């Protein structure tokens, strides 16, 4: 049995990571999407253990101390991390493991797993990104401003990634992301 591959997928909030990943995973059930842990509150419809592992800050910090995360970072006032053991288990089973994580987490993974493929998902424009974030209607103006500021940093880091995919037309973006992950 061959060893699997880790693929890191990063992109600004609102760029469409969830939509594209849903399409990719429906076409590639052999791939494994790592479920991240977070201290943020669940959004409507999100289920613990399916979308994220929702933890208190104290629980999260205990897991950091016990080195249970492959990577972790603070983003928009919340902690996010990738539980280590499921990733290692799935890679050892020969599966492609996708980590949907923030920029700082991607940088940590580059240090700990230099063979991981790093893919940045980009918006067609900052204006379109802002429209998508506002369309969610889940955040106040201050949170939107923070996300847009962070997006500038993330877009500026695109050169650090092995592949970049622009999410403009959905079908084209799905095809490009599929190639970035599996080829």
Curated annotation (Swiss-Prot):
This protein's GO CC annotations: cytosol
UniProt cross-references to PROSITE patterns, sorted A to Z: GUANYLATE_KINASE_1, GUANYLATE_KINASE_2
A Pfam family per the record: Guanylate_kin
GO molecular-function term, one example from the UniProt record: ATP binding
Keyword Lipid biosynthesis: no
Span of domain Guanylate kinase-like: 4-182
Catalyzed reactions per annotation: GMP + ATP = GDP + ADP; dZMP + ATP = dZDP + ADP
Domain of life: Bacteria
Record has Nuclease as a keyword: no
Transmembrane portions of the chain: none
EC number: 2.7.4.8
Main location group: cytoplasm
Enzyme class: transferase
Keywords: ATP-binding, Cytoplasm, Kinase, Nucleotide-binding, Transferase
Job description of the protein: Essential for recycling GMP and indirectly, cGMP. (Microbial infection) Catalyzes the phosphorylation of dZMP to dZDP, when the bacterium is infected by a phage that produces the substrate for the synthesis of dZTP (2- amino-2'-deoxyadenosine 5'-triphosphate), which is then used by the phage as a DNA polymerase substrate.
Family according to the record: Belongs to the guanylate kinase family.
HAMAP family: Guanylate_kinase (MF_00328)
Name used for this protein in its record: Guanylate kinase
Organism: Synechococcus elongatus (strain ATCC 33912 / PCC 7942 / FACHB-805)
Lineage summary: Bacteria, Bacillati, Cyanobacteriota, Cyanophyceae, Synechococcales
